[in-house]
Amino acid sequence: MARRCFVTGKSAKAGNARSHSMRATRRTWGVNVQKVRILVNGKPKRVYVSTRALKSGLVTRV
């Protein structure tokens, strides 16, 4: 299962890590997702949800 937010669709982003000499190496920034039980179509389901969605009240835990 992809580490993607079920509600907002947030996923990992890629970019460059820059050293002191500005040499670039590829890296990824992960999204802070938690596996929680929420109501989906009236039934409880365990999905990955970003902490931003949890804090803002976009989902209600079961």
Curated annotation (Swiss-Prot):
Single annotated GO MF: structural constituent of ribosome
Span list, region Disordered: 1-23
Disulfide bonds: none
Glycoprotein among keywords: no
Keywords (A to Z) from UniProt: Ribonucleoprotein, Ribosomal protein
InterPro entries, per database record: Bacterial_rp_bL28, Ribosomal_bL28, Ribosomal_bL28/bL31-like_sf, Ribosomal_bL28_bact-type, Ribosomal_bL28_sf
Annotated GO CC locations: ribonucleoprotein complex; ribosome
GO biological process: translation
Pfam families for the chain: Ribosomal_L28
NCBIfam families per UniProt: L28 (TIGR00009)
Membership in a protein family: Belongs to the bacterial ribosomal protein bL28 family.
HAMAP family per the UniProt record, alphabetical: Ribosomal_bL28
Protein name (Swiss-Prot/TrEMBL): Large ribosomal subunit protein bL28
Taxonomic lineage: Bacteria, Bacillati, Bacillota, Bacilli, Bacillales
